[in-house]
């Protein structure tokens, strides 16, 4: 997964976008759900269940984009994001699917 933009200015920027790329190298279609876990700077976390079913055709790739909105009560700091694709009760993304992060800052240049 990847995130853009990586830096958000609190009070100016409203959201960042998570990009999830899922490759299906098997000969069968898979159907599952994307889930995100956002770990806040204070150590608490938010579970984002997108609540939609994704179908990845056999021997193909799926690219999905989801927005994460920055609420007024969110603090300045680094937010870590774990992206998962759940199929048949299992997380099927490989170790190469790296978690990512973004920063909420007070002003440009921080």
Feature names for model-found ranges:
Residues 1-56, 60, 66, 80-86, ...:
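Primarily secretory-pathway and cell-envelope proteins
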């Amino acid at each position: 997964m990847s995130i853009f933009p990586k830096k958000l200015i609190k009070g100016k920027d409203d959201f960042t976008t998570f990009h999830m790329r899922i490759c299906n190298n098997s000969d069968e279609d898979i159907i599952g759900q994307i889930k995100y876990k956002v770990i806040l700077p204070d150590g608490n976390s938010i579970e984002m269940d997108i609540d939609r079913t994704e179908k990845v055709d056999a021997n193909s790739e799926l690219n999905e984009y989801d927005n994460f909105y920055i609420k007024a009560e969110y603090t300045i700091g680094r937010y870590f994001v774990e992206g998962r694709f759940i199929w048949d009760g299992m997380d099927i993304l490989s170790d190469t699917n790296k978690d990512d992060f973004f920063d909420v800052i007070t002003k440009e240049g921080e």
